[in-house]
């Protein structure tokens, strides 16, 4: 038993960070060891040494396993059970995106576009320098699993569709360009979020978004009642062309950011904060009453802003058609912020991708991990609320 294994994870982590110069690596190792032991406890229905009639089996020691991460090699002790049935998904799930990141860094080095830092990182991670053939082998294994995810059939309907894009720097033919990463998330009738697609595009054009949505429909996307996105003209046009039956909700967070363009640089008052409050109202009538009061208060001081708001704000109020319990989840694209933060954290290490394929590989690997976590988590929203909401609307219309 190592020095830290007899302690709780929190106590061990504190000791490590205070005394060990390689503290971060040991913190990650300690946490992952705890995960492995907890997985075994769950599989056996009992903790180590616990006597209970619910026990499903017994432990049978450990075997060593090395996990490659960006903080170095982690030596872990994987628990075994007597029947030999226990298995963990920790390594495959964790290393998918790590392998994608390592392969990207290595590819940069082999192509001669990296720095001494990149060479040091890749050699520290894997213990050796990379050849073109070893990178190709890594990429082939990754691409096979990611392709299956990207091309899977969408058998079930998705009531809500959230679309967003972010930009990454990619080197193509010796020129560094910003390329769009298009992302689609759906919410199914079980109330779970699913990442439906992640693709690269040269830019966020109408044709790029149209092709993206057409491919989604070709894989079986159906039943979309509401699409949430920003107001990019090409995206909005593509939604209207490919999914005309769906209502559109303009992300109110993007809307409020856009409002800054219509204000003096130093306005220094609560104008936009008061506008933001109307999105917390119970229903559309309350929101419109607040809007009328807001326009009356600020129209003299900021006529350019209030005129723009009056013309465009209706696009941000579509979510009031939904059950109140769904408002906070569907009035913006904020649900994608955590995924985007994780992508940003990983891609920051690379800065400039050596090609489009390496960028897509890493972002998709991260998307698969997020998708798996979402599918195992509790449902995101209760879709019974929407079912009851629709029934009530039908009764009122009769």
Swiss-Prot record:
Q: Which PANTHER family match?
A: TRANSPOSASE FOR INSERTION SEQUENCE ELEMENT IS1081
Signal peptide location in the record? none
Q: Does the keyword Lyase apply?
A: no
Query: Which GO terms are recorded in the biological process aspect for this UniProt protein?
Result: DNA transposition
Organism, as annotated: Rhizobium meliloti (strain 1021) (Ensifer meliloti)
Q: Which UniProt keywords apply?
A: DNA recombination, DNA-binding, Transposable element, Transposition
- MF terms per GO, please? DNA binding; transposase activity
Matching Pfam families: Transposase_mut
PROSITE patterns, A to Z:
TRANSPOSASE_MUTATOR (PS01007)
Homology family: Belongs to the transposase mutator family.
Q: What is the lineage of its organism?
A: Bacteria, Pseudomonadati, Pseudomonadota, Alphaproteobacteria, Hyphomicrobiales
Q: Which InterPro entries match?
A: Transposase_mutator (IPR001207)
- Full protein name: Transposase for insertion sequence element ISRM5
Explain the purpose of this protein.
Required for the transposition of the insertion element.
């Amino acid at each position: 038993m190592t020095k830290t294994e007899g302690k709780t994870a929190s106590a061990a982590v504190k000791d490590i960070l205070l005394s060990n110069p390689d503290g971060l690596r040991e913190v990650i190792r300690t946490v992952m060891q705890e995960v492995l032991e907890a997985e075994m406890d769950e599989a056996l229905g009992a903790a180590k040494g616990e006597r209970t009639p619910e026990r499903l089996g017994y432990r049978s020691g450990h075997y060593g396993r090395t996990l490659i991460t960006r903080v170095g090699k982690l030596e872990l002790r994987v628990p075994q059970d007597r029947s030999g049935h226990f298995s963990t998904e920790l390594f495959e799930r964790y290393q998918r995106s790590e392998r994608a990141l390592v392969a990207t860094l290595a590819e940069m080095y082999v192509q001669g576009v990296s720095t001494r830092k990149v060479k040091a990182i890749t050699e520290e991670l894997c213990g050796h320098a990379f050849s073109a053939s070893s990178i190709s082998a890594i990429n082939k294994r990754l691409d096979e699993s990611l392709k299956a995810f990207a091309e899977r059939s969408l058998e079930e309907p998705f009531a809500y569709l959230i679309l967003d894009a972010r930009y990454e720097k990619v080197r193509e033919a010796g020129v560094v360009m910003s390329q769009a990463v298009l992302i689609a998330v759906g919410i199914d009738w079980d109330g779970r979020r699913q990442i439906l697609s992640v693709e690269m595009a040269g830019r966020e054009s109408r044709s790029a978004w149209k092709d993206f949505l057409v491919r989604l429909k070709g894989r079986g996307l159906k039943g979309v009642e509401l699409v949430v996105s920003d107001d990019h003209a090409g995206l909005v046009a593509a939604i209207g062309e490919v999914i005309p039956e769906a209502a559109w909700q303009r992300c109110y967070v993007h809307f409020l950011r856009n409002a800054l363009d219509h204000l003096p640089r130093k306005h220094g008052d609560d104008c936009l904060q008061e506008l933001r409050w109307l999105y917390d109202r119970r229903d559309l009538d309350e929101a419109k009453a607040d809007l009328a009061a807001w326009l009356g208060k600020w129209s003299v001081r900021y006529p350019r802003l209030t005129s723009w708001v009056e013309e465009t704000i209706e696009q941000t109020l579509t979510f009031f058609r939904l059950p109140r319990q769904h408002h906070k989840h569907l009035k913006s694209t904020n649900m994608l912020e955590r995924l985007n933060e994780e992508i940003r954290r990983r891609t920051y290490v690379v800065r400039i991708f050596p090609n489009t394929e390496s960028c897509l590989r890493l972002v998709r690997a991260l998307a698969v991990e997020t998708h798996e976590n979402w599918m195992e988590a509790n449902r995101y929203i209760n879709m019974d609320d929407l079912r009851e909401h629709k029934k009530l609307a039908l009764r009122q219309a009769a």
